[in-house]
Amino acid sequence: MAVATTEELYQRLLRSIREGVDLQPKMVNVGTVIQVGDGVARISGLEQAMASELLEFPPKAGRSEPVYGIALNLEKDSVSAIILGDYLGIEEGDQVNSTGRVISVPVGQALIGRVVNALGQPIDGKGPIQTTTYRPIERIAPGVITRKSVDTPVQTGIIAIDSMIPIGRGQRELIIGDRQTGKTAVAIDTIINQKGQGMVCIYVAIGQKRAQVAQIINILEKYGALDYTIVVAATASESAALQYIAPYAGCAMGEEVMENGVMIDGREVRDALIVYDDLSKHATAYRQVSLLLRRPPGREAYPGDVFYLHSRLLERAARLNEDYGGGSLTALPIIETQANDVSAYIPTNVISITDGQIYLETDLFNAGIRPALNVGISVSRVGGAAQTRAMRSVSDRLKIDMAQFRDLAAFAQFASDLDATTRAQIERGQRLQEVLKQPQFQPMPLEEQVVILFAGINGYLDDVPINQIGRFKAELFTYMRTAHPEVGKMIYDNRLDRKFPSPEIRSAIENMLKEFKQMSDFSAEQA
């Protein structure tokens, strides 16, 4: 290789000065890798490193791009870091540079409609993300003074949830259940229902199969939900380190929406909904990272700070008061249980952190009751504060009635004869159960939920055969949309007075029921 002459070096220096290259010397703390394996590197010489500082493994022969890591263990004579990316090219003796900053991800308008990895890098083939706005993934949660009580509903479009376990903007509501009980389906339906509601959605996939993530992205595209959604994917094939930071990266993107807003359909939006799917796999990834870092294991081999792992994440969900912009970040964490055991370590941790839980049960799912909601142990600690006046008035008794119906139905299996009151209660419960059934990807508007619940609770469906409830629902909704659109608008705008229900709703249901009986040719005796 030819050696550059003094003249050539001088010319290069002049050219650099003309082009404005910064020739000022920079002081960089440099360390050396003394041990590496399984995505963890021990580094000597970085005595000045901060906790959670971003470290750079610079390019070398065989690696054109730098690899980054996060310093997690600060020991007496070394630093242990998890490596974000391909660690196979890192060897003993490699140089490591301190960056003096914590890991940040791109945020803001440019991410809407994109699929990114845990570092905020695009993985959807739509080109680079054009943004100059970055946020650190870790941040202290908003303080008490900056918050406002939760009082605005997040309409999930799922009648069983909106009526009995209402979710408010700024709430943390856990979705918990065994595998294959419809947890992700509830979250995806909620995202689909936010179309036109002024909400940005963030879906964080942690440790899932790539095929499953691709299927979810296709569903969001099909229903037009990707236009206001960000997907953050750290799949099962990626390192435990990336799965560990993925929810924090998604949360940083949501906080940008909450605090500074983005434009959706020509208007500013400051409300965000984030789904963590799921935090069981997140805890497993953190356990793997901690064991590789030689941290002492505790219960079920999880490290001692596994509670703080999730509490510092979920506490960042908030409703800000008007002085701080009035935005909100609503969190829907998902936890997978084993054999319906909600008293295991991670489930109890997350239940105690969140503001309620939606418990989905395998037996109900297999019985065809979908969503498979167990009313008895599902709860929202925000309650009626996050409901409109009309929904609150029809759903006050619903949860108690449904819980009592489940108990009576279980008792009735062993009883030979039942008194008339108990039989009537069971029959009404069966009809309400049919009302609460809902197919996937078919969110129900608020006004339709209120009307059908009012009909069910007040006995208008008592004479309708159970197998005709679905048909009656569809025809009632069509009738209300065509004959009484003003009632639906009043419910949606929350303009009904305290004398709910309005006479129009009663007369509409009675007229529809009369027509339905004539068309269907059934009587109370046939029911």
UniProtKB/Swiss-Prot annotation:
Known EC number: 7.1.2.2
Gene Ontology cellular-component annotations: plasma membrane; proton-transporting ATP synthase complex
Entries under Gene3D superfamilies matching the protein: 2.40.30.20, ATP synthase alpha/beta chain, C-terminal domain, P-loop containing nucleotide triphosphate hydrolases
Pfam family, one: ATP-synt_ab
Annotated compartments: Cell membrane
Family membership noted in the UniProt record: Belongs to the ATPase alpha/beta chains family.
Function text: Produces ATP from ADP in the presence of a proton gradient across the membrane. The alpha chain is a regulatory subunit.
Name of this protein: ATP synthase subunit alpha
Protein's gene: atpA
